[in-house]
């Protein structure tokens, strides 16, 4: 839901227009200074989109009329994936996803391969009207390169619910750029989400006591 919340905000320029009014610019009340548009038929690219979170984003995006692009090294969704045969969910190479999407959402885990995997080259592949959204882990994006791209207005904007350092350093340009929108890592804080975390924890403890260990790694 956090990803789609960002999509909705960007498509209606809610961040910018609310800020304008709060700053006392009521004279611009009906001025069309920020482009807004419908999200129907827009493309959302999901990096790491074949996983649980990416699939959940697709579950919301598809009924809104969006087309979903997913990057996959194998070039296909895992066998049995719920969208394996959907004509509105396409698996494409990463570069094509970046170049074609109106919204790019990062939904992959942070590891040695994904750390700083989104930087200057990747951002410059995106459309100038596109938005980058990160609700995964901050270090997946090279923030120094992102900041330079946002200063150059390479893309329309980015929404960061996660950052490399949380909160960012007080002197970070992330605070100063009007096309960068920060939220304080709230994607997991919804009441229902936190209740699920509590339920999962108690279920895992109960299973361990009964000798039925779940989610074994090794």
Residue ranges and their predicted role:
Residues 1-19, 59-66, 200-210:
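Oxidoreductase and adenylate-handling cofactor-binding alpha/beta cores
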Residues 1-43, 217:
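Phosphate-binding beta-alpha-beta segment of Rossmann-like dinucleotide-binding domains, i.e.
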Residues 36-40, 62, 124-125, 174:
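Short, flexible hinge/linker loops that cap or flank conserved catalytic cores
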Residues 46-47:
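Hydrophobic Val/Ile/Leu positions in short beta-strands of Rossmann-like dinucleotide-binding domains
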Residues 52-53:
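Hydrophobic/small residue at the entry helix of a nucleotide-binding pocket
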Residues 68-70:
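Short beta-strand "acidic-cap" motif of Rossmann-like dinucleotide-binding folds
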Residues 74-173:
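Rossmann-like adenosine-cofactor binding region
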Residues 168-169, 177-196:
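Adenosine-phosphate binding glycine-rich loop
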């Amino acid at each position: 839901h956090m990803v789609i919340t960002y999509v909705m905000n960007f498509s209606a320029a809610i961040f910018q227009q609310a800020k304008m009014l709060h700053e006392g610019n009521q004279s611009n009340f009906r001025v069309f200074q920020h482009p807004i548009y419908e999200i129907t038929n827009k493309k959302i690219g999901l990096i790491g989109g074949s996983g649980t979170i990416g699939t959940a984003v697709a579950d919301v995006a598809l009924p809104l009329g969006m087309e979903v692009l997913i990057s996959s090294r194998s070039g296909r969704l895992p066998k049995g994936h719920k969208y394996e045969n959907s004509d509105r969910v396409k698996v494409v190479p990463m570069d094509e996803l970046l170049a074609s999407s109106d919204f790019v959402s990062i939904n992959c885990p942070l590891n040695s391969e994904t750390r700083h995997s989104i930087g200057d080259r990747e951002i410059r592949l995106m459309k100038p009207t596109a938005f980058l959204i990160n609700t995964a882990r901050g270090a997946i994006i090279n923030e120094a390169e992102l900041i330079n791209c946002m200063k150059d207005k390479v893309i329309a904007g980015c929404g960061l619910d996660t950052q490399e350092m949380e909160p960012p350093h007080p002197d970070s340009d992330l605070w100063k750029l009007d096309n960068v929108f920060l939220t304080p890592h709230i994607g997991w804080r919804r009441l229902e989400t936190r209740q699920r975390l509590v339920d999962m924890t108690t279920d895992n403890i109960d299973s361990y006591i009964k000798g039925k260990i779940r989610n074994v790694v090794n």
